[in-house]
């Protein structure tokens, strides 16, 4: 079932004048999202831990003639809330009103039974896939609320709705992502113009 009318396509200026931050923008789905947003007119802020890969995506966007993106090297295994707050302060100091935040960065971790999952792997997966989502959204919320109709988009997985053996911490993190999305959407629904999906 599709909610998009047959034949509909977004215009190349659909996101003109919008600023969208994409985590995990250095490859895969995050790269595709960043490229698509840029091709529809958005200024994209590319966030990831591998600056060389982010630069490659930056170059692709510039070569397409899209608005010049920004690069934000940030390792989401970092647990220090001050780092996320500093990023928000830097963006605020640059007068950025954030129209979109796409949480795409994710770590798969070990594909083994939960009883055999190492605590280090568990911690890394939950940190990147959920705690960093919380910390980054929390820090950036004032910038999102400064935009007239901002949106927070979280990437989930089928194993975040129905657990499967050997998907371990990844599945648990995606269940947490789904729950976080629902709670945040409910909290903001009556008090803010920020949408959460």
Show which residues each predicted segment covers:
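Conserved glycine-rich cofactor-binding loop
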Residues: 26-27
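Conserved glycine-rich Rossmann-like NAD(P)H-binding loop of the short-chain dehydrogenase/reductase
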Residues: 42-56
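Rossmann-fold cofactor-recognition segment
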Residues: 64-79
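Substrate-binding pocket helix/loop in short-chain dehydrogenase/reductase
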Residues: 112-114, 121-126
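Active-site helix of classical SDR
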Residues: 137, 173
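Alpha-helical segment proximal to the catalytic Tyr-Lys
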Residues: 142, 186-190
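Residue(s) in the substrate-gating loop at a strand-loop-helix junction
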Residues: 157
């Amino acid at each position: 079932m599709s909610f998009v009318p047959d034949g509909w396509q977004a215009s190349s200026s659909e996101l003109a004048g919008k600023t969208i931050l994409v985590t995990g923008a250095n490859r895969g789905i995050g790269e595709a999202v960043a490229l698509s947003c840029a091709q529809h007119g958005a200024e994209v802020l590319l966030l990831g831990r591998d600056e060389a890969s982010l630069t490659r995506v930056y170059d692709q966007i510039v070569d397409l003639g899209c608005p010049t993106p920004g690069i934000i090297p940030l390792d989401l295994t970092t647990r220090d809330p001050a780092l996320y707050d500093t990023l928000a302060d830097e963006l605020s100091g640059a007068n950025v009103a954030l129209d979109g935040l796409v949480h795409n960065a994710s770590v798969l971790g070990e594909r083994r039974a939960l009883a055999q999952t190492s605590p280090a792997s568990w911690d890394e997966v939950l940190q990147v896939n959920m705690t960093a989502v919380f910390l980054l959204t929390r820090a950036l919320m004032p910038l999102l609320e400064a935009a007239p109709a901002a949106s927070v988009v979280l990437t989930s997985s089928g194993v975040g709705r129905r657990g499967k053996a050997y998907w371990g911490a990844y599945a648990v993190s995606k269940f947490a992502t789904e729950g976080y999305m629902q709670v945040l959407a409910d909290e903001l629904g009556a008090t803010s113009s920020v949408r959460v999906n």
